Amino acid sequence: MKTLHLLLLISGLLSVFVKGVGSHPGTVHVRFKCIPKIAAVFGDNCPFYGNVDGLCNDKKSVCCMVPVRLDNI
């Protein structure tokens, strides 16, 4: 049940952040990065945390989802 809720959360976040297909200026994509759990506890600036299968499988890390605009790349 937790996995289902997590998948719904991630798909909801992706639908909010991914506003278009392709590389048009102003398009927002989501980047994933793994950070140590201790950094997450002590204030790493991450807007959304989650788990993604196959990414950040280490028990000592969490997955951070960061929205990125293509004009900032």
From Swiss-Prot:
Query: Is the keyword Disulfide bond assigned to this protein?
Result: yes
Q: Where does this protein chiefly localize?
A: secreted
Query: What's the source species for this entry?
Result: Rattus norvegicus
Q: Which residues form the signal peptide?
A: 1-23
Question: Which Cys pairs are S-S linked?
Answer: 34-63, 46-64
Listed A to Z, the keywords are: Antibiotic, Antimicrobial, Defensin, Disulfide bond, Secreted, Signal
**The keyword Signal appears for this protein:** yes
Give the top-rank taxon of the lineage listed in the UniProt record for this protein. Answer: Eukaryota
Q: Briefly, what is this protein's role?
A: Has bactericidal activity.
Cellular component, GO, one term: extracellular region
Record family assignment: Belongs to the beta-defensin family.
Against InterPro entries, the record matches this protein to:
Defb50
Gene Ontology BP, a term: defense response to bacterium
Q: Which Pfam families match?
A: Defb50
> What is the protein name stated in its UniProt record?
Beta-defensin 50
Query: Where's it found, cell-wise?
Result: Secreted
